[in-house]
């Protein structure tokens, strides 16, 4: 039993450490301290705005649990954010932007900006429970003003990061994404496709969800080669129907997306 507990703790710690590794690796020693009050929320893509809303809510919980000395629940909330909200969701979606977009592309620049924000906040959140790890990472960032993560103040998150309407919208988009992922997994299980990038999606939605999804790229959210949205048959009582097919064409050697035409992102 003791051995199992030790292995479980190691597994949990590795998850958190891997989150920091991902942040540091993508920032590539170019950490920039950002004034949260001066961030223009509207210039960020919706995905980043949604993640800032989640950070705002988690910071509220962080203060409550910290003041109540409820470190166990605090640790669980932070772990949930690292493993589900960041690793399994945000990083998964944005890895295409980070690895395949040009360094100077606006979306990539704003993604890097968000990673800077997340790294700074995570270090301050985890400092009370992972003191040595956060100090080690902080020393790599070469921030001279304070000299130690434990001399930093807890993050003060601006109120304009809180956007419940956007959160409600993304709750619906994530439901659609989950349905898409389930459909993709069925095709993978039947060996019709390998990775999700071998899939094309046809997403049938009711009128309300079509309006809600306007401007959303589900091929990006679901990591597929293509995604098309269409109106669901009025006689059908379901809100969401997903049809997944094998993508046809040539694989782009950079982003690995499959298309019958040359990849417009990487023509040069």
Question: Where in the sequence are the language-model features?
Answer:
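Structured ligand/cofactor/substrate-binding pocket environments in proteins
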Residues: 1-24, 76-79, 110-135
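Conserved phosphate-binding loops in nucleotide/dinucleotide-binding enzymes
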Residues: 1-11, 68, 72-73, 163-171
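Acidic, turn-prone loop/beta-hairpin segments
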Residues: 29-60, 91-183, 190-205, 230, ...
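Hydrophobic residues within the alpha-helices of tandem HEAT/HEAT-like
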Residues: 82-83
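A glycine-rich helix N-cap at a beta->alpha junction
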Residues: 215-230
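Short, flexible, mixed-charge glycine/proline-rich loop motifs
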Residues: 241-249, 256-257
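Short cysteine-rich clusters marking metal-coordination/redox-active sites
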Residues: 252-255, 263-266
């Amino acid at each position: 039993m003791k051995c199992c507990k030790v292995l479980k703790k190691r597994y949990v710690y590795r998850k958190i450490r891997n989150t920091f590794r991902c942040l540091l690796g993508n920032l590539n020693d170019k950490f920039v301290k950002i004034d949260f009050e001066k961030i223009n929320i509207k210039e960020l893509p919706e995905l980043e705005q949604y993640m800032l809303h989640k950070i705002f809510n988690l910071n509220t919980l962080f203060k409550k649990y910290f003041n109540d000395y409820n470190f166990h629940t605090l640790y669980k909330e932070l772990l949930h954010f690292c493993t589900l909200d960041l690793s399994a969701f945000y990083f998964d979606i944005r890895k295409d932007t980070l690895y395949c977009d040009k360094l100077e592309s606006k979306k990539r620049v704003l993604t890097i900006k968000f990673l800077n924000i997340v790294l700074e906040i995570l270090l301050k959140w985890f400092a009370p429970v992972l003191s040595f790890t956060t100090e080690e990472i902080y020393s790599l960032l070469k921030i001279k003003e304070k000299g130690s993560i434990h001399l930093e103040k807890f993050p003060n998150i601006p109120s304009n990061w809180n956007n419940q309407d956007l959160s409600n919208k993304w709750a619906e988009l994530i439901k659609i994404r989950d349905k898409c992922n389930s459909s993709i997994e069925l095709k993978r299980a039947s060996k019709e496709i390998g990775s999700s990038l071998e899939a094309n999606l046809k997403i049938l939605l009711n009128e309300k969800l079509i309006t809600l999804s306007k401007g959303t790229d589900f091929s990006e959210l679901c990591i597929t080669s293509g995604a098309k949205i269409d109106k669901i048959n009025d006689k059908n009582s379901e809100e969401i129907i997903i049809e997944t097919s094998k993508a046809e064409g040539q694989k782009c050697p950079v982003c690995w997306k499959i298309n019958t035409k040359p990849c417009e992102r990487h023509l040069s």
